[in-house]
């Protein structure tokens, strides 16, 4: 094989892989992308607050059973136009929600509790009303590119007086 042929093959393979990388962004919610972080994470007690329109939030426990830190960097769902990871912080003596821009870090052996009044996943631009008894799929995306779909039941919730109309 000549040097030119090897270079041409390597360039072709690189172009194909680059094209596939661009396609990987739109994974179906029912498929898990294998990877170290997604493989070591278990979600339990997941639920999303019922809402007629606008915004709502998803909650639950995310346990890292892996040997390294798992970092949730995003989420997707066909139920909403966009999802954001939110954390609650104290600013000027008052608690406020803000986007968790560096994601949710979950050390090995630890559990992240997503709860009203604390860290949660915001679903913005609901595409249809979410009514108690329904289930939606939310796919968690990790910093290593792996993903994990979660079936999330919709529940009525009036506690904590959360307002997601923002």
From Swiss-Prot:
Keywords: Cell membrane, Lipoprotein, Membrane, Palmitate, Signal. It is found in: Cell membrane. A lipid is attached at residue 23 (S-diacylglycerol cysteine). It comes from the Bacteria. Residues 1-22 form the signal peptide. PROSITE patterns: PROKAR_LIPOPROTEIN (PS51257). A lipid is attached at residue 23 (N-palmitoyl cysteine). PANTHER family: BLR7088 PROTEIN (PTHR36302), COPPER CHAPERONE PCU(A)C (PTHR36302:SF1). This is Putative lipoprotein Lxx21020. It comes from Leifsonia xyli subsp. xyli (strain CTCB07).
């Amino acid at each position: 094989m000549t040097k030119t042929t090897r270079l041409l093959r390597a360039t072709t393979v690189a172009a194909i892989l680059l094209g596939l990388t661009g396609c990987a962004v739109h994974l179906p919610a029912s498929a898990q992308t294998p990877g170290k972080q997604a493989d070591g994470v278990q979600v339990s007690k997941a639920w999303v607050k019922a809402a007629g329109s606008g915004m709502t939030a998803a909650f639950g426990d995310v346990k890292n059973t892996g040997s390294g830190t798992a970092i949730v960097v995003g989420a997707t769902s066909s139920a909403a136009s966009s999802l954001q990871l939110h954390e609650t912080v104290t600013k000027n003596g008052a608690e406020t929600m803000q986007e968790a821009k560096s994601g949710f870090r979950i050390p090995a052996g630890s559990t992240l509790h997503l709860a009203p009044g604390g860290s949660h996943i915001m679903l913005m631009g609901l595409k249809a009303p979410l009514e108690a008894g329904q289930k939606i799929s939310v796919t968690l995306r990790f910093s290593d590119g792996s993903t994990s779909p979660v079936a999330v039941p919709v529940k009525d919730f009036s506690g904590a007086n959360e307002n997601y109309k923002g």
